[in-house]
């Protein structure tokens, strides 16, 4: 298993380190490291600290912060930036941009699981400037061009 460096910024995280829930889990839960409950009104966004900083250190990897499916489906709580991208050379605290897209207020409690962190491979590429592309089956067809069903 690949390891990355983590710095615990909030002592409460000593007992709440992210862990894979099952052997098939892709994401590690991130928690809201807040001192008191926060009420997030419909349409509001809040930047929530996680109490952790990571340093991946290897440009062949990055991390993405994704919403937890239950939070979005049941409560309308999703990420304000939709997906958070953490570059391999970032060393600051992981923060979760939290947006209430629902119709009701949501109370976020201290240490509540809020989002998930997924480590992904990255391929850095260069560009080869061309005048034209070799033809492909799809061509330049965009949104909806491959059919409805």
Curated annotation (Swiss-Prot):
It holds the Pfam family dUTPase. Keywords: Hydrolase, Magnesium, Metal-binding, Nucleotide metabolism. Its EC number is 3.6.1.23. GO terms for molecular function: dUTP diphosphatase activity; magnesium ion binding. The keyword Flavoprotein does not apply. GO terms for biological process: dUMP biosynthetic process; dUTP catabolic process. It is an enzyme of class 3 (hydrolase). Pathway: Pyrimidine metabolism; dUMP biosynthesis; dUMP from dCTP (dUTP route): step 2/2. InterPro entries: dUTPase (IPR008181), dUTPase-like (IPR029054), dUTPase-like_sf (IPR036157), dUTPase_trimeric (IPR033704). CDD domains: trimeric_dUTPase. Substrate binds at residues 68-70, 81, 85-87, 95. It catalyses: dUTP + H2O = dUMP + diphosphate + H(+). Gene3D superfamilies: 2.70.40.10. Its cofactor is Mg(2+). NCBIfam families: dut, PRK00601.1. This enzyme is involved in nucleotide metabolism: it produces dUMP, the immediate precursor of thymidine nucleotides and it decreases the intracellular concentration of dUTP so that uracil cannot be incorporated into DNA. Belongs to the dUTPase family. PANTHER family: DEOXYURIDINE 5'-TRIPHOSPHATE NUCLEOTIDOHYDROLASE. This is Deoxyuridine 5'-triphosphate nucleotidohydrolase. The lineage of its organism: Bacteria, Pseudomonadati, Pseudomonadota, Betaproteobacteria, Burkholderiales. The gene is dut.
């Amino acid at each position: 298993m690949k390891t990355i460096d983590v710095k615990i910024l909030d002592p409460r995280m000593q007992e709440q380190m992210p862990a894979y829930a099952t052997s098939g889990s892709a994401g590690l839960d991130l928690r809201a490291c807040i001192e008191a409950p926060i009420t997030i009104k419909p349409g509001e966004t809040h930047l929530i600290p996680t109490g952790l900083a990571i340093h991946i250190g290897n440009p062949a990897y990055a991390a993405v912060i994704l919403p937890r499916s239950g939070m979005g489906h049941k409560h309308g709580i999703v990420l304000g930036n939709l997906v958070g991208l953490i570059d391999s050379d970032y060393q600051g605290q992981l923060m979760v941009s939290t947006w209430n897209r629902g119709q009701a207020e949501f109370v976020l409690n201290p240490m509540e699981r809020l989002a998930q962190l997924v480590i992904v491979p990255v391929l850095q590429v260069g560009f080869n400037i061309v005048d034209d592309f070799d033809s492909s089956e799809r061509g330049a067809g965009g949104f909806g061009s491959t059919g409805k069903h």
